[in-house]
Amino acid sequence: MEITVFYDYICPFSFIGSRRIQQIGAEYGIEVEWKGYQIHPEYPTQGKKRRQTFRAIRTAESLQSVMEEEEIKFKLPGFVTNSRLCLEAAEFSKTKGKFIEFHNLCYESYFLERKNIGDQDIVLAIGDKVGIDSDELEFNLKSGEMAGILESYRVEAEKIEVLGVPTVIFNDFRVHGVQSVETYRSIIAKFSN
């Protein structure tokens, strides 16, 4: 069984889905391949005020109940940001064997601490917390080395019609949006038979 996840750090559904997929991966001993997919490349790195539309309020309310199920004290940031630097740093963290720690801390920094993960200083601090040398990470981010990997993920996502994040692929079976742990288990059971 192969599991691939397309995710973005500014998507609260990716945050929830990530936790659930990590649980499933651990439960079944399946290594998960994580692929960063930037859903809003047009957003500025300094952030953009989150609009308070009826839809946004309803989404926040439904997220709140799901977060409570996950026992997360969730608070939707009042802004949205550009996740590119954080996604590039996540790719770099893979080369250091620190991906899951970095990945989880990116979500926590944005959704629990309301930090701007589009800001390079924040990204470097996250790296430092998980044991990645700040100077090395900064050099890598400035080099743009990981941008090519993200671009290859984007091309792949468009080719296989990833419509949003999270998108979880079990072998060749694609699931859009966050699902319950039970749903993920039933998908794995289906492919195990």
Language-model features: locations:
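C-terminal cap of thioredoxin/glutaredoxin-like
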Residues: E2-T4, I16-Y28, F54, L105-N193
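Aromatic-flanked redox-active Cys/Sec active sites in thiol-based oxidoreductases
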Residues: V5-I10
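Structural alpha/beta surface segment adjacent to cysteine/selenocysteine redox centers
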Residues: F15-E113
